[in-house]
Every structure is written in structure tokens, then in C-alpha cells.
């Protein structure tokens, strides 16, 4: 893809997301979502192959279905209220359909089926864009309409997403699928706290974006896509491999790394609101995610996969991939926990 075309597509994606985030009119918000969806499809198919074509087709069909559901709920809501304002949603049916459409766009349970398959079929950097930037527009809508939604349904979706995100990643060896299931689980954590502290949802989203962008960027340096390729990079780039392992620990939520902050604050806030059982269930289910992160770290640092002797050592090719601002990203993804009092004060 030519750089000028890529720049135009990225600008279109940015404009579509910004249009959705700044709009208070349902029609403009829907148009922004559609611009965003149509513009990212060429990014998903940047490397022409049957797998990327299949992934882009699955993504388009799922997102088009979600867009139809969203437009259906918008039309019904406008017919009942006579207004296009996003906060004028008082019909229970329209709230339920809108929630289903947004959950499908975010890839949350029970509409999570497309996320691992699409992420596995595209490149690492396209997967990074799919699991980070594409979450912003739907979450910005949720932050505006959550008071009109049923809190019990939101909490049920959150618990199921955390469970599926942990359970689905247990037997995976493909790093992109593992990160896809991790994304599903993190979306569940964000939804669980949405009803009680929306600002904490935004902080959780910001930390998730930092961690995921850092991990994808570091994986892209050596083009690591499986556990096998990851385990064979110690001899080529040991510092990069160490950075990957620390980022995985942070994504799993272990102290004293940055990823511990959102889980700690969410569980604390749920406990303050007398949801001790919910906080306990979420903490237990988070162990599933931590298990497959630790399994990745164990297989990478303490074992060597059974390969041919002449394949164990990777050739020392000259490093050609340069990642902009990688060092600050790594620092933010691992060492931000001491700043947590200041971050919570901002909320």
C-alpha cells in the first residue's frame, strides 16, 4: 500500500472516530461509526492473502449487522421521542437493542465470536489498531447512554466477558488470539465499573490501550506470532523478549506493574458499593487470564520447544523495524503504579 493512500485511510479512521466521540446527535454518531468501519477494512487487507480477506469479510459482516441493529434502535427511539438526541432514550426495547449493537462492535460476550478469528487473520499492527483504536467510538457512546441501560444486564455481560476472555485463551498458542481474548476480558472489567464510576472506565481504557499498543509494538519487532517463535528469540533479542514478558505480567495485573492499578481500583470500588460477591467472582476469573500469561512466560523463559537443531538459533539479521516512542511506552506500561494516587485524583 502506498504511503499516501495509507495516510489518507488513517486520517479517515481518525475523523470517523472523532465524529462519533464529539456528536450528541444519533445520526451523526452512526455516520461516524460507519466511516470508521469502512475505512479500516483496507488496513485489515493490507497484506493480500486468503486469511486476511476472510478476516476482513468476517469483520465487515459482523459490524454491518451491528450497524443495522443500531440504526433500527435509533429509528424506533426517534419515532417514540421525536428527538435525535443521544440522551433521549427511555424505551426499554431501544436500550436493549442499542446495547446489543454496541456489545457486538466491542466484541463482548455473547457477540465475541469474531474477535479471535479476525485478529488471527491479520497482521500484528492491523491487530493492534483493531483491538485499541476501534474500541474508542463504541465506548464513547456507552459512556453517554449507560444511565438508560439495565444495570443487571451490563453486569451479566461484564462477568461473561471476563469468563470467556479467560477461558478462551487457556489452550491457545497463537499470540494474536491470546491478545484477542485478553481484549474481551478487559472490556468486561470496563463494563463492570461503568455503572458506578465512569471516569474509572476511561482510566481503565487508557491503561489497556497503553499495554496493548506496547505489547503489539514489541511483538512486531521480531514478528512473533506464536509461542514457538517467542521462545526462540532469547538468543536474538534478549532485551526485547524480556520487555515482552514484563508487558505480559503487567497485562495480567500483577503488582507492582501498571496493569495492577485498574483491577485494584475496580475491585475496591465494587466493594465500596456492597458488591463484594461480584468483586470476588471477577478476581477469581482474572486468575484464568493470569494463568495463560504465566504459561507464556514459563514456556518462553524456562523451556525450549522441540525443534530441529539447525532451527533453534535465529539468524542475526540487521534490525530494520523501528518503533516510534517505544521506550516511553514500555515505561508507561510497566512503571505507572506509583502515580496511581495522582491518576485517581484526576478522576
Curated annotation (Swiss-Prot):
Catalytic activity: a ubiquinone + NADH + 5 H(+)(in) = a ubiquinol + NAD(+) + 4 H(+)(out)
Compartments where found: Mitochondrion inner membrane
Regions crossing the membrane: 3-23, 25-45, 59-79, 96-116, 127-147, 150-170, 193-213, 240-260, 274-294, 323-343
Source organism, top-level taxon: Eukaryota
GO MF annotation list: NADH dehydrogenase (ubiquinone) activity
Keyword Chaperone among record annotations: no
InterPro entries, sorted: Complex_I_Subunit_2 (IPR050175), NADH_DH_su2_C (IPR010933), NADH_UbQ_OxRdtase_chain2 (IPR003917), ND/Mrp_TM (IPR001750)
EC number(s) recorded for this UniProt protein: 7.1.1.2
Alphabetical keyword list: Electron transport, Membrane, Mitochondrion, Mitochondrion inner membrane, NAD, Respiratory chain, Translocase, Transmembrane, Transmembrane helix, Transport, Ubiquinone
GO biological process, any: mitochondrial electron transport, NADH to ubiquinone
One cellular component term from this protein's GO annotations in UniProt: mitochondrial inner membrane
Membrane topology: Multi-pass membrane protein
Enzyme class, broadest EC rank: translocase
Pfam families found in the cross-reference section: NADH_dehy_S2_C, Proton_antipo_M
Keyword Chloroplast: no
Assembly and binders: Core subunit of respiratory chain NADH dehydrogenase (Complex I) which is composed of 45 different subunits. Interacts with TMEM242.
Family note: Belongs to the complex I subunit 2 family.
PANTHER family to which the protein is assigned, alphabetical: NADH-UBIQUINONE OXIDOREDUCTASE CHAIN 2
Function: Core subunit of the mitochondrial membrane respiratory chain NADH dehydrogenase (Complex I) which catalyzes electron transfer from NADH through the respiratory chain, using ubiquinone as an electron acceptor. Essential for the catalytic activity and assembly of complex I.
Protein name: NADH-ubiquinone oxidoreductase chain 2
Organism: Lemur catta (Ring-tailed lemur)
Gene: MT-ND2
Amino acid at each position: 500500500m502506498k504511503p499516501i493512500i495509507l495516510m489518507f485511510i488513517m486520517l479517515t479512521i481518525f475523523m470517523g472516530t472523532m465524529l462519533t466521540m464529539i456528536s450528541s446527535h444519533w445520526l451523526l454518531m452512526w455516520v461516524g461509526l460507519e466511516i470508521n468501519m469502512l475505512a479500516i477494512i483496507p488496513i485489515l487487507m493490507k497484506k493480500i492473502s486468503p486469511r486476511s480477506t476472510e478476516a476482513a469479510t468476517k469483520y465487515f459482516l459482523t459490524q454491518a449487522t451491528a450497524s443495522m441493529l443500531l440504526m433500527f434502535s435509533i429509528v424506533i427511539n426517534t419515532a417514540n421521542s421525536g428527538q435525535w438526541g443521544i440522551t433521549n432514550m427511555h424505551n426499554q426495547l431501544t436500550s436493549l437493542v442499542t446495547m446489543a449493537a454496541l456489545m457486538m462492535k466491542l466484541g463482548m460476550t455473547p457477540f465475541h465470536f469474531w474477535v479471535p478469528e479476525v485478529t488471527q487473520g491479520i497482521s500484528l499492527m492491523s491487530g493492534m489498531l483493531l483491538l485499541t483504536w476501534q474500541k474508542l467510538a463504541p465506548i464513547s457512546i456507552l459512556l453517554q447512554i449507560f444511565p438508560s441501560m439495565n444495570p443487571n444486564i451490563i453486569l451479566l455481560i461484564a462477568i461473561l466477558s471476563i469468563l470467556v476472555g479467560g477461558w478462551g485463551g487457556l489452550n491457545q498458542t497463537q499470540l494474536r488470539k491470546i491478545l484477542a481474548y485478553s481484549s474481551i476480558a478487559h472490556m468486561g472489567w470496563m463494563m463492570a465499573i461503568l455503572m458506578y464510576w465512569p471516569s474509572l472506565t476511561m482510566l481503565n481504557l487508557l491503561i489497556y490501550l497503553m499495554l496493548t499498543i506496547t505489547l503489539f509494538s514489541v511483538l512486531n519487532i521480531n514478528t512473533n506470532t506464536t509461542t514457538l517463535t517467542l521462545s526462540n528469540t532469547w538468543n536474538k533479542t534478549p532485551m526485547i523478549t524480556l520487555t515482552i514478558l514484563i508487558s505480559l505480567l503487567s497485562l495480567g495485573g500483577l503488582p507492582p506493574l501498571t496493569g495492577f492499578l485498574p483491577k485494584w481500583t475496580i475491585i475496591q470500588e465494587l466493594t465500596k458499593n456492597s458488591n463484594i460477591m461480584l468483586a470476588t467472582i471477577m478476581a477469581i476469573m482474572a486468575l484464568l487470564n493470569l494463568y495463560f500469561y504465566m504459561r507464556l512466560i514459563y514456556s518462553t523463559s524456562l523451556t525450549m520447544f522441540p525443534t530441529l537443531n539447525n532451527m533453534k538459533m535465529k539468524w542475526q539479521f540487521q534490525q530494520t523495524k523501528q518503533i516510534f516512542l517505544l521506550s516511553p511506552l514500555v515505561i508507561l506500561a510497566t512503571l505507572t503504579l506509583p502515580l496511581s494516587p495522582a491518576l485517581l485524583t484526576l478522576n
